[in-house]
Amino acid sequence: MEGVEPLGEDLNLLRAFYELGVRSVGLTHARRNAAGSGGIFKPSGSPRDGLTNFGRDLVRECERLGILIDLAHINPRGFEDIVELTSKPLIVSHTNARKFYDIERNASDEQIKMIGKRGGVVGVNAILVSPDPQTSTIDRYVDHIEHVISLTGTDGVGIGFDFCEYLFLQLPESVRAELAAKLTTPHFIPDLTNHSHARNLTRKLIDRGFSDEEIEKNLRDNWLRIFKETL
């Protein structure tokens, strides 16, 4: 579940979704809701408030039930609140390193370290790798992977492609312009836009000197580990 709007402010609905099979919850998207506020697609300016009382209760109930908490879209203060309120591994399912693209939607070095210390996984996103279309490449994508590894070790990184160019291209030009003004202009990696392109990433990881074991961890094993440990 990405954004807990379907719950309103009713924890009983969280339990109902759990019974229906939901095992991972991200509290917000890039907006405010009853649980907290999302991080914006700019270097600063996200709401400074943390989780609401409902959001804090929700986090505690997720941990009690065994629902994996995803911090991909939460604002910086909400991120800190979730870390403080929990003890189990956490994930950021699809993000990038602010070192290469400095927006609050991406993860700071300190946030990446928090996830690593908890035994969680940071999934690297195939969209927000660079503010410049010329450097939105698979090489820059691998730069993000290497940076996360430098902060968490090889067990702390995964793939979080978030492929959505096909959706973006279906939108009218006016809607694309509105999204660009409100969020940011996405720069898609030309040879990494759908799942059939995953082999291009594997080839690049080999070219960049990753071992077979490291590649397997990046592409599969780290996610499998966290799912087995927490779900």
Predicted features and spans:
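A general structural-boundary detector
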Residues: 49, 102, 185-188, 202, ...
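Charge-dense, low-complexity intrinsically disordered segments
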Residues: 45, 49, 135, 188, ...
